[in-house]
Structures are given as C-alpha cells and as structure tokens.
Amino acid sequence: MEQTYVMVKPDGVERGLIGEIVTRIEKKGLKIVAGKLMQIDRELAEKHYAEHIGKSFFEDLIGFITSGPVFAMVLEGDDAIATARRMMGKTNPLEADPGTIRADYAIHTNRNVIHGSDSLESAKREIQLFFAPQEILSYQKAIDTWI
C-alpha cells in the first residue's frame, strides 16, 4: 500500500473544513493512518518548503503556513499519491476541475486549503518531517475483509 502526506492548511482549518475534507478522503477509499492538529513553527516550515528557499514568495509562504494550526495526515491506499492529488485539484483554484477540494473551497493560489505530496520521494520526506514512526498506525477497515 502506498502512503502519502496531506495537510489541511491554516485557511482550511480556520474555515472549519477539516471534517469535509476527511469525509471526502474516506469516501474515496483512502485510509487515514495518522492525523494531528498542530502548529507549524518556522524551523519545520523551512524544512517542509526547502525547495522554495530564495524564491520571491518564500517569506509569504512561511508566514502563511505558520499563521495558524494545520491538520496533518498520512493517507494509505492503492495509488494514494495520485488519488489525493486528483481530489485536491490544481494549485490555482481557478484552474482546478469542478468538484475538487480546491475548486470547491480555495480562494486564491496562496490560500488553497490543502497540500499533498507530489511524488513518492516527497511523501516519504514529508511523512518523516511531520510524524514519528509510532504515530502511524496499521489497521484493517471493516470493508477490507470483503474486497
């Protein structure tokens, strides 16, 4: 089973969208194997967005992601990374397909409600940044015995 990292950003938390997003994830068949509400500090934010250091938008990005709590999750399932990315929609909500999380809830590219790993490598790196191994659980969903 593939794992991916997904995070409801501060704008999503502040707007009360955690439940809606979790519902969509579970209805799609992805399993949440770790989750926590947390406040990201600057050090963790810089590690998370290290590839953007030196870019013109870096300080705004760090300021936003540390501005309020986030809901961090590890999702598990067949093709979990691609499935989560399709559910989220394009980064720019104006370009996101109707019915995606960003098309339905995001206001602006810089306030786009949700983050998800874009590759297996980034998923592994982000999961390790945000979760200790003992925080990631393994369990069987009731429907698993029937599939």
Swiss-Prot record:
Its cofactor is Mg(2+). Its main location: cytoplasm. One of its GO terms (molecular function) is ATP binding. Its EC number is 2.7.4.6. ATP binds at K9, F57, R85, T91, R102, N112. The active site is at H115 (pros-phosphohistidine intermediate). Pfam families: NDK. Keywords: ATP-binding, Cytoplasm, Kinase, Magnesium, Metal-binding, Nucleotide metabolism, Nucleotide-binding, Phosphoprotein, Transferase. It is found in: Cytoplasm. One of its GO terms (cellular component) is cytoplasm. Homotetramer. NCBIfam families: PRK00668.1. Belongs to the NDK family. PANTHER family: NUCLEOSIDE DIPHOSPHATE KINASE (PTHR11349). This is Nucleoside diphosphate kinase. It comes from Listeria monocytogenes serotype 4a (strain HCC23).
